[in-house]
Amino acid sequence: MADDLPAMAHGLSALSRFFIDDGTLGATLLRVAQLACQVSPADMAGITMLVDGRPATGVFTDPEAPEIDVAQYDTGHGPCLDAFRHQRVYRIDSIADDARWPEFARMAAAHGITATLSIPLSARGESLGALNLYSRAAVFDQLVTEQAEVFARQAAIVLSNAQVYWDARQLGENMRQAMQSRSAIDQAIGILMADGGRSPDEAFQLLVRASQRKNRKLRDIAAEIVEGVSRRGGAAAG
């Protein structure tokens, strides 16, 4: 119900207890969208965000949501996009009577949607996207809107923390791979130096030429050389 304060309290409590490492960033986004439906009278929810540099419905609770949103992404106009761009709340009480986004309105009406509510998601001064709620009935009154804004503010903090966490994890993984690559390359250079009496630069250039000739990454060529020596060493020891 629109005045279901216990549901809102439950949703906010669930957000505050959310463990970022419980899943992927996509799982975090989806959980936020699902909670938004639980604390509001919306029939479905989606989150507009940048995907590969372009606005898109990154997650949704119903496959109809991205089908509705595609009209605004194609035309560049719609409540979800405007909420994202301008960091303002946009509410449509009656799709049939709203003339601001005609293409979006036609698509929403075709899916039986009567009302929508788009709320910006921002934290630490950064625009993260927009939370979009859809209903087949005119249920987004002022109280629902205010409650949804409270939820969106808390959700934005969760999403921002999740983004920071997963960015840090990715950076750590990239650094780990870089260190492994550097180690393999250094070992391969040492092997080539010992094998042919080459200088460090000559050994490195040999790796580079092999990488270019075979159209493979330098670290993969190096790892193959190191693995080959390890296999020969193991066979000799056996």
Task: Name each model-derived stretch.
Residues 50, 65-102, 106-114:
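Regulatory sensory and allosteric helical modules in signal-transduction proteins
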Residues 3-10, 14, 20, 156-170, ...:
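Signal-transducing alpha-helical linker
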Residues 2-13, 17-60, 69, 77, ...:
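Helix-loop-beta substructure at the N-terminus of cytosolic sensory domains
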Residues 130:
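Short glycine-/small-residue motifs
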Residues 149-156:
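Allosteric cytosolic regulatory segments
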Residues 114-122:
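A short, aliphatic-rich beta-strand micro-motif
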